[in-house]
Each structure stands twice: as C-alpha cells, then as structure tokens.
Regions:
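Acidic active-site catalytic centers that drive phospho-/nucleotidyl reactions
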Residues: 14, 76, 127-129
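N-terminal beta-strand motif that seeds the catalytic metal site of vicinal oxygen chelate
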Residues: 1-17, 68-70, 136-145
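Helix-adjacent hinge/juxtasegments
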Residues: 57-85
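Short, solvent-exposed coil/turn segments
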Residues: 3-5, 37-39, 48, 63-67, ...
Length: 145
C-alpha cells in the first residue's frame, strides 16, 4: 500500500506575511481560500515537490514558529543556498553533522562545510515566524527510495 505525504500544516501568526515570504522563495500559490468568519487556508508548493504546505487562520493549535526540522531535498545545496540568499532569505552556511548520520537538534554537532556525500550536507533557514527549514543535499538516492 502506498502512502504519500500530501500536505504539512504550518503554524504562523501573520498569514499575509507568510504568504509573501513563501511566494518570494518561488513556491507556487495553489490556493488562498477565505471561509466563514476568520477561517482562511493558503496552500503553496515548493518547486518539484509533490507535498505542499498550508497555513492560515483556524487550522492548527500549534504555536506560530514552533516547527523545527522541516526538510527540503535539493540536488545542489550550494546553488540552492545561493538562490535563496539572492531572494533575500537568511540561510546558514552549509554544514554536516560531526557524527556523520543526521543533523542534531539546534546547532549542536554542526561541522562546517559540506559532507561531500549524498544525504550528508545541510543548510537551514527560518520563515518570519521562526519555523525552521533544512535543505538536505541528496545526489544519489538509496535503493528503494
């Protein structure tokens, strides 16, 4: 049985500010629906992704900016980092985990520079609310992925 991740709900404080930010990343605006009362749903999709994000009003009880560890897979982390910086995003330097497996929480065990292996290099940025995203470079997928 296939199960595919379709959407991630992000907690944000200011829907319009978040919409401007994610559109500035080059993400496709799929919907901006205003419902009854204060209910609103905005959906955007990163380039090449089958999974979208949604945020709005009345969607989640999670506090704005509370998500950490959202992953965006890229095939060239340096080029993606440069493009995001050119779009006005504050992106960390490229790093890898000193333990060589996966990045630790926060900034612990960050080693400077790329790992020069698929799955091993990361960079991070946050949206205006503080939801933290990670770029992860994958050049060759593991079998079955």
């Amino acid at each position: 049985m296939d199960m595919k991740l379709e959407v991630v709900i992000l907690p944000v404080a200011d829907v319009d500010r978040a919409k401007v930010f994610y559109e500035s990343l080059g993400w496709r605006l799929d919907a901006d629906f205003v419902g009854v009362g204060a209910f609103r749903v905005v959906q955007l999709t990163p380039p090449g992704s089958a999974c979208s994000i949604i945020f709005g009003s009345g969607l989640t009880s999670s506090p704005p900016g509370s998500y950490d560890g959202l992953q965006l897979v890229v095939d060239d982390i340096e080029a993606t980092r440069t493009e995001l910086i050119e779009r006005g995003v504050d992106v960390s330097e490229v790093f890898h985990d000193a333990g060589g497996v996966f990045h630790h929480a926060g900034h612990e065990a960050r080693a400077a520079g790329p790992a020069h292996q698929s799955y091993g290099s990361f960079a991070s940025f946050s949206d205006p609310d503080g939801n933290e995203w990670y770029l992860q470079e994958i050049t060759t997928r593991l079998p079955g992925r």
